[in-house]
């Protein structure tokens, strides 16, 4: 659970950093650039911690995808950028892609049952091998044939 919190923090820092970059380019001040550098660096640190337990593909897709959706929303609201039907379609496809990637990483019940079955069969095979090995012991040299 803690790793998901780090992923959320990484997304928040990335959004703040990217919006600060836009603010710096519009205002011409250095404050936005300093905030951008700090937030982007912090974002990568949090992302690096998150991927210790969250699948890299999922973490990166969520980090970039959710970040893009939030950044686009605030760019329209704060900076007056346009949002066309084509951009909305792209954002919808992005969200659909993130959903597919996230849902594809869950371990299914079938996979667990298959793994358990393979382990069970391997255990039985080991037992059989032990029995067969005991039956196939060589006849000792001190036993005389009749």
From Swiss-Prot:
MF annotations from Gene Ontology: amino-acid betaine transmembrane transporter activity; antiporter activity; choline transmembrane transporter activity; spermidine transmembrane transporter activity
Main location: membrane
Keywords: Cell inner membrane, Cell membrane, Membrane, Transmembrane, Transmembrane helix, Transport
Matches recorded under InterPro entries: Small_drug/metabolite_transptr (IPR000390), Small_multidrug_res (IPR045324), Spermidine_export_MdtJ (IPR023740)
Domain of life (superkingdom): Bacteria
Cellular component aspect of the GO annotation: plasma membrane
Membrane topology: Multi-pass membrane protein
One Pfam family recorded for the sequence: Multi_Drug_Res
Annotated signal peptide: none
Example GO biological process: glycine betaine transport
Compartments it resides in: Cell inner membrane
Annotated TM spans: 1-21, 31-51, 54-74, 76-96
Family: Belongs to the drug/metabolite transporter (DMT) superfamily. Small multidrug resistance (SMR) (TC 2.A.7.1) family. MdtJ subfamily.
Reported function: Catalyzes the excretion of spermidine.
Assembly and binders: Forms a complex with MdtI.
NCBIfam families in the cross-refs: PRK10452.1
Protein name: Spermidine export protein MdtJ
């Amino acid at each position: 659970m803690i790793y998901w919190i780090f992923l959320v923090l990484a997304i928040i820092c990335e959004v703040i950093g990217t919006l600060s970059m836009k603010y710096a380019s519009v205002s011409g001040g250095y404050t936005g650039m300093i905030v951008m550098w700090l937030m982007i660096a912090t974002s990568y640190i949090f992302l690096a911690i998150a991927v210790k337990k969250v699948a890299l593909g999922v973490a990166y897709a969520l980090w970039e995808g959710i970040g893009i959706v939030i950044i686009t929303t605030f760019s329209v609201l704060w900076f007056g950028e346009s949002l066309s039907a084509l951009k909305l379609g792209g954002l919808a496809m992005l969200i659909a892609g993130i959903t597919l990637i996230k849902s594809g990483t869950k371990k299914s019940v079938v996979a667990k049952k298959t793994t358990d079955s393979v382990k069970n069969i391997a255990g039985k095979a080991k037992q059989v091998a032990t029995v067969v090995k005991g039956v196939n012991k060589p006849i000792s040299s001190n036993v005389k044939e009749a």
